[in-house]
Amino acid sequence: MKKIIICFIFVFSINVSFADATSELIDKIKNIHSMTANFNQKLIDGQTNNNLNSKGNMSLKKPQYFKWITTSPNNQEIVSNGTKLWIYDGDLDQLIIKKVSNDIAQFPYLILLSKNTNNINKLFTVTAQDNNSYILKPKNDQMIDSIKIKFTPNNQLEYLEISTSLNQFTKIEFNNVKTDVDISNTSFDFKAPQNTDIIDETKFA
């Protein structure tokens, strides 16, 4: 009987710990209403042993707007106004237009735009670490193994780490972070440069 009680207390304490970690993370994400930052991104492909470093700038505004601009080594822009998603490759002069998807596996930073942050509890098992960071383990997603979100002492986003089932690891470090800034909604509409090859997948969806 004593063993059963001890096991129950242990399991209960784990569940409480997960709940506390999830609540802490949700509170931090809720406090990010808008954000701009520069980023440095490192992709390590465990299958090919190739590394890819890139950098650029980003902005987001709840509940649905984000912009991700890579300036080096290639020119690429990913922009969404909540309805459409534009993926522009400046080197290829090509633009792909898609309907907005909530696919976190494709764009892990979408978790910061979650309209209903309580869904984090449904999608992930969250554990807190001592250095103001959180490990998210998907409950169903087969593509992502884990997401790590690290905050600074004043609760600004410091970095994201994403590990996938394809043995790929991505770390995105943020600097010059500004939160709760005034960003116009129209800045999240994309206008293609002249002579751009446009593939509009929304017409076939």
From Swiss-Prot:
Keyword Oxidoreductase: no
SUPFAM superfamilies: Prokaryotic lipoproteins and lipoprotein localization factors
Localization (cell): Periplasm
Highest taxon in the source lineage: Bacteria
Pfam families: LolA (PF03548)
Example GO biological process: lipoprotein localization to outer membrane
Residues annotated as signal peptide: 1-19
Keywords: Chaperone, Periplasm, Protein transport, Signal, Transport
UniProt keyword Cytoplasm, yes or no: no
InterPro entries linked: LolA/LolB/LppX (IPR029046), OM_lipoprot_carrier_LolA-like (IPR004564), OM_lipoprot_carrier_LolA_Pbac (IPR018323)
Entry's Gene Ontology cellular component terms: outer membrane-bounded periplasmic space
Entry's transmembrane regions: none
Family classification: Belongs to the LolA family.
SUBUNIT field: Monomer.
Annotated function: Participates in the translocation of lipoproteins from the inner membrane to the outer membrane. Only forms a complex with a lipoprotein if the residue after the N-terminal Cys is not an aspartate (The Asp acts as a targeting signal to indicate that the lipoprotein should stay in the inner membrane).
Protein name: Outer-membrane lipoprotein carrier protein
Species this chain originates from: Francisella tularensis subsp. tularensis (strain SCHU S4 / Schu 4)
Lineage, broadest ranks: Bacteria, Pseudomonadati, Pseudomonadota, Gammaproteobacteria, Thiotrichales
